[in-house]
Amino acid sequence: MFNLILWPLFLLTSVAIPLQLTLEVVYLTSSVDFSKASAAKTATSLGQSPVVITIYKSLLKYWSLYEFIHFIYLYTPIDAFLNFLPFTSLLMSFGSICLTRELVYDFIAFMESQNKLTGFLNKITEPNFNSYLLFSSIYNIWFADDTNDKFLFGKLTQILISVTKRYEFPRTFYLAKVSDFLQNLILTRLRPFVTEQPQGDKNRYQNGDRESTKNGAAYQKSSQQSSSFEQNFTSTEFPNDYDFMEDILDETTELD
């Protein structure tokens, strides 16, 4: 009976709301007509919007963690062990709520950077804004037509933002910590397979070195000439402070 109550809450916080935020971000950031916008203006706008990069990274980390837990972790013996522990569903629901709140906070920061929050949403944090005004405002949002609504899901997204801004909790960063931990763990496990060279490849390379001993001097001479040519070419044509992207942007601006 307890799981029947927590399971819808877990689906809402772990799937429905993150999917809603993901589609909202894609919808709001796809309003730029890239066929008409120049490359210089597009790159400049992206470079001046670090909050956009932050929300994309947060969504990528969340869905990567979701895939890892539901399609890799749940098929291991650890899942069978957790089924015998009490309050496992409660802990999973609490964890999904914490991670989803972090996504909502990043989405609110993204909306504030884009200046797309309405006047109602900006008044949520005022001291005289009580719970009665909150629910009455939610009622007005749901049943009143808003011509300035820019959200894909409309009033559902406005209600989600308004409730989150009204009942704020201390900001946490569990999503970034868990994602970095799993990334380091996976890289640590994969590093021996990448750095280790098979014995067959070692023997093959050793035999190849013996056969190419006669041509070693000629190859070394040609490689030295090639290296000197690359150094001279790099020093004359491409200095150390050369930025290829800035060159492209300058040429694109001149064409515009």
From Swiss-Prot:
* Record topology, Cytoplasmic segments: 89-256
> What residue ranges lie in the Lumenal compartment?
17-67
Give compartment(s).
Answer: Endoplasmic reticulum membrane; Preautophagosomal structure membrane
In alphabetical order, the GO MF annotations are: protein-macromolecule adaptor activity
Induction of this protein: by what? Induced in absence of NAP1. Expression is increased by rapamycin, which mimics nitrogen starvation by inactivating the TORC1 complex.
UniProt KW Transmembrane helix keyword: yes
Q: Where is this motif: ATG8-binding?
A: 242-245
The entry describes its oligomerization and partners as: Interacts with ATG8 and ATG11.
> What else is noted?
Present with 1890 molecules/cell in log phase SD medium.
| Protein name (Swiss-Prot/TrEMBL) | Autophagy-related protein 40
